[in-house]
A protein has these predicted regions:
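Pol beta-like nucleotidyltransferase catalytic core
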Residues: 1-44, 54-83, 88-181
Length: 181
């Protein structure tokens, strides 16, 4: 039995008003689908106004549109969140996945192709195909306990802490040399 810590809401998503990169565009494609199909996912970010989202020349009003947020607000009370990096790469990941993991919120994620090597078994994987991804998100909403990942936030903190990882990045010998100079 998978035990879920108490969180008052199921799923969130963060969007900006940017559309230059592939991740920006895919966020807006997902958001359009979510809002037009009335899927119960709360939306945060500068790409929205409290209660209002503009898309395809239309304005959509919804109580699910929360607007700008404080750093961890879209994660603390949510079991799941949708995380889409601005671009895909082999080893780059950002606060888009770090903040949810530190909040013990399971990310549905696309971006870093090798994310499992950094955060094994902590991530649900989006594909970039709107139909497959919406199917996954709807299944998560129907059966949260079946998809929830138990996240060791201490291990996440260790993985992303620059101070703890400096010797891994530069090697212990390089650190000793720079101290002696």
């Amino acid at each position: 039995l998978n035990v879920i810590p108490f969180k008052s809401s199921c799923m969130s998503m963060v969007v900006s008003n940017r559309t230059e990169l592939s991740g920006h565009l895919y966020r807006h494609i997902l958001l359009d689908y979510i809002l037009y199909n009335n899927i119960p996912i709360d939306i945060y970010g500068n790409g929205t106004d409290r209660g209002l989202y503009k898309t395809r020349g239309k304005q959509i009003k919804s109580t699910r549109i929360k607007g700008p947020f404080k750093r961890y607000e879209p994660y603390h009370e949510y079991m799941f969140t949708i995380c889409i990096e601005n671009t895909r790469s082999k080893h780059y990941f950002s606060e888009k996945i770090i903040n949810p993991l530190l909040s013990n919120t399971t990310p549905s994620y696309i971006g870093c192709e090798n994310i499992e090597s950094y955060f094994p078994n902590n991530v649900l994987h989006l594909t970039g195909d709107i139909h497959q991804d919406m199917n996954l998100l709807i299944n998560i909403l129907r059966d949260p306990a079946g998809y929830y990942k138990k996240i060791d936030t201490f291990k996440v903190e260790q993985k992303v802490s620059l101070i703890q990882n400096v010797s891994k990045l530069y090697g212990k010998q390089s650190i000793k040399e720079s101290k002696n100079n």
